């Protein structure tokens, strides 16, 4: 027991030393959770999260919101829509938006995804630009140049610092990014480990403009329940399949019948080719059954109800490049 206690004390000392190092690099001062709420008048604002694919934007969003509103996988382009997560206290409301990673589009769906990221630059009160400790700062220079010209507060989040071996490595990374975004405040953190995220949250609260809330105080998101069902199913496809199949998939909920204790859901998975349909279903339907089981369990956790899930697969040729289908699937207004 003595060794366990000593280990915990040692870990806490290391954590505090790391926080002191970050404070010295960035000028931030740690803020206890119960001291971070703003005072009257009420504050509210839109905080948009942008950056390249696979830097941890969705992980950060979920950590800031305190709920799993964005799906997370190791694959790039997991986020296709602009997803809202809302944080409420008596003193403030923060409307976070997670956006697709910035990319050079190869088809119309990706053009729509890029549009969400670009649009996030136009309607934010505060902008979070997320990168990580391995990303090349010159990637997508045109988008970064637009971020650098923003007149609103820009917070540069350097994620995944738990992967670094020395503080010197962090100093070099911060210095490189400050050359590109000289006016941004820098927040090195690990969203996965929840390290330094409270300091980021505290600064966001400080920067919020005075405003009444934009949504009801019990709101978590502006997305309907069906949206989260489709995202959970798509997440299971992304984690169970490789190559082009997960990127060729769209999910539509055809039926969502909710009673007091259960939900009956019927959803269609669209792919672009017959060969993809065969791969998705698997031998004897084994793969589709696996996806359905995994999705059903997560949907039950999300809604805290028993779920009956039926999945069907249909072919919709080249839907990612067809404007009418992108409108039908909610990517284009």
Q: What is the predicted function of each stretch?
A:
Residues 91, 115-184, 257-259:
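Conserved C-terminal guanine-recognition region of P-loop GTPase G domains, centered on the G4
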Residues 153-155, 162-221, 225:
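Canonical P-loop GTPase G-domain recognition
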Residues 50, 54, 60, 83, ...:
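Residue-level signature of catalytic and energy-coupling elements of molecular machines
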Residues 225-333:
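P-loop NTP-binding site
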Residues 56, 196, 287:
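Conserved glycine(s) of the Walker
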Residues 70-72, 139, 212-216, 239-250:
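Active-site phosphate-binding and catalytic loops of NTP-dependent enzymes
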Residues 79, 102-104, 136-137, 164-165, ...:
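Catalytic P-loop NTPase motifs of RecA-like helicase/translocase cores
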Residues 2-115, 119-121:
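Conserved G1/Walker A P-loop phosphate-binding module
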